[in-house]
Amino acid sequence: MSLYRKRLKIVRGEGIYVWDSEGKRYLDLIAGIGVAILGHNHPKWVEEVGNQLNKLVVAGPMFEHEEKEEMLEELSRWVNFEYVYMGNSGTEAVEAALKFARLYTGRKEIIAMTNAFHGRTMGALSATWKSKYKKDFEPLVPGFKHIPFNDVEAAKEAITRTTAAVIFEPIQGESGIIPAKEEFVKTLRDLTEDVGALLIADEVQSGLRTGKFLAVEHYKVEPDIVTLGKGIGNGVPVSLTLTNFDVERGKHGSTFGGNPLACKAVAVTLRILRKERLVEKASEKFIKVKGKDVVTTRGRGLMIGIVLKKPVGRYVEELQNEGYLVHTSGQRVIRLLPPLIISKEKMMEVKSAIEGVINGDTEG
């Protein structure tokens, strides 16, 4: 399946660009759905991660290795969590978070949000909202319920002393790039603290992209658990679940999680982000698209949703024809998740290209 009628075969990448099998170059504003955060073939990243391939790829979770120490040192420059569990994908990070919440609290109930997307494994899928992802796999994990996103009163009614955790995305990625409201996030934090429940911020898509390392930092709220994935390894499959409490050894685990290659990829990615100040600079690159069919532009930094009055499929295809690869987030939202190395000037070019395609449409 593809967004595009003509499915591209991508054969190589360099920086913010990719090339197809016919030699055509495209400005990549999808980045593997937010994964290639340093762009493609970043020379320093390729050098260091390539060297790791020649040194040590796996060691087994029962051993320590210097790459893990290097990664933890780099991570500590960004966040202040005491414990890190490493997996291989965003949905694994969410599964770990849900299990840890039940272990820590001794409770079963998980509260998630309408229109949320947390992954496709059974626990994460139970926290996900849309029926199209879930219906063929029911019954799912019991104990999950959903409340309306950004509804303070619904949160007050739902969160009780039977609640193990509340999980939310600071910016909902799959349902239209919808930011959480400040009052809502602070209410979630206050309520969970009051009843002894945990607050889980799913930052798999929003992490690193919004001008701060974690999007939840914009709200000046500290969650109990954070999940990270996608761009954290710049293409190497890896995810992190961050907590400030320990979990009994053996209660959860992964064969590949925390392997030397993944740890090196995270360490190098974080070091480049830090030295080039790419996370902070993302806040300067947000664009607001204008046009006759544009309702609004949502998001923060380089997590952008352009909301239109009509389905976006034809615009996505036209942009591809002009050499711009964009994604969707629902039927009426163009989603941009470009590499953080993209310049402000290039984002202005993207703005002009999208406006040109939208405003050039004279059909109803």
From Swiss-Prot:
Its cofactor is pyridoxal 5'-phosphate. Pathway: Amino-acid biosynthesis; L-lysine biosynthesis via AAA pathway; L-lysine from L-alpha-aminoadipate (Thermus route): step 4/5; Amino-acid biosynthesis; L-arginine biosynthesis. GO terms for molecular function: identical protein binding; pyridoxal phosphate binding; transaminase activity. Disulfide bonds: none annotated. Keywords: Amino-acid biosynthesis, Aminotransferase, Arginine biosynthesis, Cytoplasm, Lysine biosynthesis, Pyridoxal phosphate, Transferase. Transmembrane segments: none annotated. Binds 1 pyridoxal phosphate per subunit. InterPro entries: AcOrn/SuccOrn_fam, Aminotrans_3, Aminotrans_3_PPA_site, Class-III_PLP-dep_AT, LysJ, PyrdxlP-dep_Trfase, PyrdxlP-dep_Trfase_major, PyrdxlP-dep_Trfase_small. GO terms for biological process: arginine biosynthetic process via ornithine; L-arginine biosynthetic process; lysine biosynthetic process via aminoadipic acid. Substrate binds at R120, S254. Its EC number is 2.6.1.118, 2.6.1.124. It is found in: Cytoplasm. Gene3D superfamilies: Aspartate Aminotransferase, domain 1, Type I PLP-dependent aspartate aminotransferase-like (Major domain). The keyword rRNA-binding does not apply. Involved in both the arginine and lysine biosynthetic pathways. HAMAP family: LysJ_aminotrans_3 (MF_02084). This is Putative [LysW]-aminoadipate semialdehyde/glutamate semialdehyde transaminase. It comes from Pyrococcus abyssi (strain GE5 / Orsay). The lineage of its organism: Archaea, Methanobacteriati, Methanobacteriota, Thermococci, Thermococcales.
